[in-house]
Design a protein with these regions (language model features):
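Short beta-strand/loop segment at the start of cytosolic alpha/beta domains
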Residues: 1-17
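Amphipathic alpha-helical interaction surfaces in cytosolic regulatory modules
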Residues: 21-99
Length: 99
């Protein structure tokens, strides 16, 4: 399955959905989601992982890069609908306090 990144903006919240693998292969599409066509300043980001089947360390790095580039505080990036193995990987990497 090819990975697909979709995004929408509701006021100051950016919504990004990842389908497929969340890894280095989506780097450009993921960066475009939060750098192109932004209509207003972003205060929070919601990342929906309902259709994401895998996340590796490069996917985790992409999340940290998003947070840094948008200069968001802790809790301003929310991951929703994580599969258990993705949640476990984030916990093992001690990234749970970032998202």
């Amino acid at each position: 399955m090819a990975s697909i990144v979709t995004c929408s903006q509701q006021g100051s919240q950016l919504n990004i959905a990842i389908a497929g693998r969340f890894d280095f292969s989506i780097l450009q599409d993921f960066r475009n989601a939060y750098t192109l066509d932004i209509n207003a300043p972003i205060d929070s980001v919601l990342i929906d992982l309902t259709s994401s089947e895998h996340m590796d360390s490069s996917g985790m790095g992409l999340l940290l890069t998003l947070k840094k580039e948008l200069q968001l505080d802790a809790g301003c990036v929310e991951l929703v609908n994580c599969r258990p193995h993705i949640r476990d990987a984030l916990l093992a990497a001690r990234l749970d306090h970032f998202f």
